[in-house]
From Swiss-Prot:
Homodimer. This is Bifunctional protein FolD. Belongs to the tetrahydrofolate dehydrogenase/cyclohydrolase family. GO terms for cellular component: cytosol. Pathway: One-carbon metabolism; tetrahydrofolate interconversion. The gene is folD. It holds the Pfam family THF_DHG_CYH_C. Catalyzes the oxidation of 5,10-methylenetetrahydrofolate to 5,10-methenyltetrahydrofolate and then the hydrolysis of 5,10-methenyltetrahydrofolate to 10-formyltetrahydrofolate. Coiled coil: none annotated.
Length: 303
């Protein structure tokens, strides 16, 4: 069954991630074209997929299409189920040393690999275009923008397409994953928000109160309908990162969309909200990594 994005009510305006991502990709293509016209190397992105998980294959296909659209050269590494951690580590070492590769993407989860963090930490931080390496997250914590985690950075871009201020607002993040919730808190702190993070140990009454107080609500848990739409503060901006497939084949988020759309000023659809922005931001990071590599190669960068 093909999922389609829900339509917002008259109360809320849709934050159309597909449209905004396309605009971002169009601008990135101009950057790549200008780079190549100036005689610089075309940005190169290594895409590593292990096994044949259908969801992972779809995500990787979307990323490869985006790379082709903007003119990034994608180097595909489709590895069989059962590929060992040692084999992946050896591949990462090769990619780290390859000057044609400016970005390395390891599609998660990695089947049969109990601790993917060891492999993430093996990636050269300058090629970590997912923004997951501890060094890059540390730079974000210090307000030193470099390669930032893609989903939070994409959400910041989405927020910039609303008519709502960010600075001085109350922001609530539900979910504290290393790849979304935690760096999202850093992004919103840097943007000037007062940030509340909720997680599995947050008492239900505190969760509800935190959601009701949020001018900006970001939910990234992966549980359909976790946040009732009736909890949404009138006039809030709702960013629903969750994507969940129901038994009837529909894709839904973590927030009750219909009720939330009656109260929010802006809301992301599921699908078609955050996901396309994550992919577009990955391309943005890859181009920035290529630009930074050129500075380092010229002798003006810090190695």
């Amino acid at each position: 069954m093909t999922a389609s994005a829900p339509a917002a009510s008259a109360s809320a305006r849709l934050l159309d991630g597909r449209r905004i991502a396309e605009e971002l990709l169009d601008g990135l293509k101009l950057r790549v074209d200008a780079r190549v016209a100036a005689g610089k190397a075309r940005p190169g992105l290594a895409v590593v997929l292990v096994g044949g998980d259908p969801a992972s294959s779809v995500y990787v296909r979307n990323k490869r299409r985006a790379a082709e659209k903007v003119g990034i050269e994608a180097f595909d590494y489709d590895l069989p189920q059962g590929t060992s951690e040692a084999q992946l580590a050896s591949l990462i070492d090769e990619l780290n040393a390859d000057p044609k590769i400016h970005g390395i993407l390891i599609q998660l989860p990695l089947p049969g690999i109990p601790d993917a963090n060891r492999l993430i930490q093996r990636i050269d931080p300058r090629k970590d275009v997912d923004g997951f390496h501890p060094q890059n997250v540390g730079h974000l914590a210090l307000r030193e923008f470099g390669l930032r985690p893609c989903t939070p950075r994409g959400i910041v871009t989405l927020l910039g397409h609303t008519d709502q201020p960010v600075r001085g607002r109350n922001a609530t993040i539900v979910g504290v994953s290393n790849h979304v919730g935690r760096p999202m808190g850093l992004e919103l702190l840097i943007a000037g928000c007062t940030v509340t993070s909720c997680h599995k140990f947050t008492p239900p009454d505190v969760l509800e109160a935190s959601v009701r107080n949020a001018d900006i609500l970001v939910v990234a848990v992966g549980r359909p309908g976790l946040i009732p739409g009736e909890w949404v503060k009138p006039g809030a901006v709702v960013i629903d990162v969750g994507i969940n497939r129901l038994d009837d084949g529909r894709l839904v988020g973590d927030v009750g969309f219909d009720a939330a759309a009656q109260r929010a000023a802006w809301i992301t659809p599921v699908p078609g909200g955050v996901g396309p922005m994550t992919v577009a931001t990955l391309m943005q990071n890859t181009i920035e990594a290529a630009d930074a590599a050129g500075i380092q190669d010229s002798g003006f960068g810090i190695r």
